[in-house]
Amino acid sequence: MKGMIFLAAAILSEVFGSTMLKLSEGFSAPLPAAGVIIGFAASFTFLSFSLKTLPLSAAYATWAGTGTALTAAIGHFIFQEPFNLKTLIGLTLIIGGVFLLNSKRTEAADQKAQLTIEI
């Protein structure tokens, strides 16, 4: 549970950093530029904490996929960036991949539990 909380914080920090990157105007706006550095530093710190209890493949896929989806939503709703069928299909594939990677982790845990019970 603690790992998932750190992962959620990593995702939100990464989305914050990405949003500030857009607002930093090529790092020429000091406050958003500082937000980029703080956001990404916090994101990698929280991600590393989450990896103490979560598998790398599942945590990284969740972090990257969810961050991508949220950043695309912010781009569309805040910055009026285009959102079309190709974008929707791409995001659906990314999110589907995250679910598949996480289901692999669940299946492995179930198999391990069954082996433990059988022995």
UniProtKB/Swiss-Prot annotation:
The lineage of its organism: Bacteria, Bacillati, Bacillota, Bacilli, Bacillales. SUPFAM superfamilies: Multidrug resistance efflux transporter EmrE. InterPro entries: Small_drug/metabolite_transptr, Small_multidrug_res. GO terms for molecular function: transmembrane transporter activity. One of its GO terms (cellular component) is plasma membrane. It is found in: Cell membrane. Part of a multidrug efflux pump. Confers resistance to cationic lipophilic dyes such as ethidium bromide, acriflavine, pyronine Y and safranin O. The efflux is probably coupled to an influx of protons. This is Multidrug resistance protein EbrB. Coiled coil: none annotated. The chain crosses the membrane at residues 3-23, 31-51, 59-79, 81-101. Pfam families: Multi_Drug_Res. The efflux pump is composed of EbrA and EbrB. Belongs to the drug/metabolite transporter (DMT) superfamily. Small multidrug resistance (SMR) (TC 2.A.7.1) family. EbrA/EbrB subfamily. It comes from the Bacteria. It is a multi-pass membrane protein. Keywords: Cell membrane, Membrane, Transmembrane, Transmembrane helix, Transport.
